[in-house]
Amino acid sequence: MALTVLLFILVISATSFGLIQNSLNEEEFYAEMQEKAVNASQVLVATKGNPDSWVKLNDLTGINSIGLAKENNVLDENKVDTLVDWNALKYAEIKEVLGLQKYDFYFKITEMDEHTVREFGILPGAEEKTILVERYILFQGTERKFILGVFK
């Protein structure tokens, strides 16, 4: 009887430890994904990129960072349109430049009423774990939302 109770306690302890470990791993996963999403959104909407004339390059190997801004939170329409045009052919390379190699991502620029003005990337499926970062920007002289989704 004592052996049965001891085995029961050991099984419960092992199961509890496994659940706690899974919970910690999931929290770590979301924290890392959140950090990557915030960093990518900051680079995109607050910087011009490096070099700041990256739109003139045909090859991403010369691009250290991709920024869409004319100035902080004011997006350059030409840069946005160039990135959107590159979506089909250069998505994987753009992910790498943004530091999102382990994830997929998308962004969209919307009117305040959620009407989409521009979008880039791959949309997540229903089962994907997704982090959203929303920023307020100026685009085409109008206040809009910039929404970045990072998922796996």
Language model features: what each stretch is:
Residues 1-8:
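N-terminal signal-anchor/signal peptide hydrophobic helix marking the start
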Residues 11-152:
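Long, compositionally biased, intrinsically disordered regions
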